[in-house]
UniProtKB/Swiss-Prot annotation:
This is Protein E7. A zinc finger (unnamed) spans 56-94. HAMAP family: PPV_E7. GO terms for cellular component: host cell cytoplasm; host cell nucleus. Plays a role in viral genome replication by driving entry of quiescent cells into the cell cycle. Stimulation of progression from G1 to S phase allows the virus to efficiently use the cellular DNA replicating machinery to achieve viral genome replication. E7 protein has both transforming and trans-activating activities. Induces the disassembly of the E2F1 transcription factor from RB1, with subsequent transcriptional activation of E2F1-regulated S-phase genes. Interferes with host histone deacetylation mediated by HDAC1 and HDAC2, leading to transcription activation. The E7 terminal domain is an intrinsically disordered domain, whose flexibility and conformational transitions confer target adaptability to the oncoprotein. It allows adaptation to a variety of protein targets and exposes the PEST degradation sequence that regulates its turnover in the cell. It comes from Human papillomavirus 47. It holds the Pfam family E7.
Amino acid sequence: MIGKEVTVRDIVLELSEVQPEVLPVDLFCDEELPNEQQAEEELDIDRVVFKVIAPCGCSCCEVKLRIFVNATNRGIRTFQELLTGDLQLLCPECRGNCKHGGF
């Protein structure tokens, strides 16, 4: 291109064969969605029982709390994030010393 404006002579088109990875995908494939019962069964298979040991959230208590949860891998990761974040578990004795709402 010479100059500030593009002319038709400056445009070069190159035609080549379409590569297989660029071919369009048929969105009307013959897949079937599972019914609700099958979906629920698949969710039940993914659940595992986990044993969680966490310290009491009170600063003066050294009690280790043990709870068991039935969760998916995603669910247990979310629970772990809560426990390492703002959520703290309390033992029954420390819970009795606290008032509802933390006041």
